Amino acid sequence: MELKDYYAIMGVKPTDDLKTIKTAYRRLARKYHPDVSKEPDAEARFKEVAEAWEVLSDEQRRAEYDQLWQHRNDPQFNRQFQQGEGQSYNAEDFDDIFSSIFGQHGQQSRQRQATRGHDIEIEVAVFLEETLAEHSRTISYNLPVYNAFGLVEREIPKTLNVKIPAGVGNGQRIRLKGQGTPGENGGPNGDLWLVIHIAPHPLFDIVNQDLEIVVPLAPWEAALGAKVAVPTLKEKILLTIPPGSQAGQRLRIRGKGLVSKKHTGDLYAVIKIVMPPKPDDSATALWQQLADAQSSFDPRKEWGKA
């Protein structure tokens, strides 16, 4: 009976990491899957690849296999294999061989290593108004179930009622321990990670912990000053526009930004001057009077003389 070269079967090197081996396994499993492949030996090759993956995907069994491979030319190793000459074997058989050659440690190899389940990550959309206070949210996701070959066999729909804390930010990750896929051989479950995505708002832009809102003003409101009702995340407030306000000017409204555990941001009102529609004769006359009264004003004086 010959010890199979699992690395050659997978087309990888003994020094390759698990990620590389897993990639090779998935490629070969798809290639030789009996339901897909038309090759005459597809089923046998598929079983051989699955057998190699069963050993190389387990850290402890891979280490034992590597040790067996290093001793494959030892007399004791050869005697053990000659006893089984002509017999078929699978990935489990080398556990017995390892035990007979290396003693008690080989017997312990039957106790498969506990493996932690996979983490799952889902995106949760949150409105700006919802960040002001803790709120409950029902989320649904699919829990993948893996077969013995490490491929997703099916998915189980799952629903949870979770609490989204106040002050969550865009891209923040919330961990729900043990809500991922089940562990193997007594290993712990994976976790569910909620990745917060703050939905775009029609009025507010986020700047770190602060908010910005564009406040449209008529030219005379900017020139003379005004009191304007400005929306915040909770309610409208009356904002005083100082006389002579300029387009792009930012007026600070304290404590009306985003909320966090350590700090509450501010709301900045960014002034935008909006011209009225095409003026009639009376409005044109008024604009002309203003132009005559301010004839010395040059809005482009900073350009200097051409």
From Swiss-Prot:
SMART domains: DnaJ. It comes from the Bacteria. Residues 5-69 form the J domain. Transmembrane segments: none annotated. InterPro entries: DNA-bd_curved-DNA, DnaJ_C, DnaJ_domain, DnaJ_domain_CS, HSP40/DnaJ_pept-bd, J_dom_sf. SUPFAM superfamilies: Chaperone J-domain, HSP40/DnaJ peptide-binding domain. Keywords: Chaperone, Cytoplasm, DNA-binding. GO terms for cellular component: cytoplasm; nucleoid. It is found in: Cytoplasm, Nucleoid. One of its GO terms (molecular function) is bent DNA binding. One of its GO terms (biological process) is chaperone cofactor-dependent protein refolding. Pfam families: DnaJ, DnaJ_C. NCBIfam families: PRK10266.1. PANTHER family: DNAJ HOMOLOG 1, MITOCHONDRIAL-RELATED. DNA-binding protein that preferentially recognizes a curved DNA sequence. It is probably a functional analog of DnaJ; displays overlapping activities with DnaJ, but functions under different conditions, probably acting as a molecular chaperone in an adaptive response to environmental stresses other than heat shock. Lacks autonomous chaperone activity; binds native substrates and targets them for recognition by DnaK. Its activity is inhibited by the binding of CbpM. This is Curved DNA-binding protein. It comes from Citrobacter koseri (strain ATCC BAA-895 / CDC 4225-83 / SGSC4696). The lineage of its organism: Bacteria, Pseudomonadati, Pseudomonadota, Gammaproteobacteria, Enterobacterales.
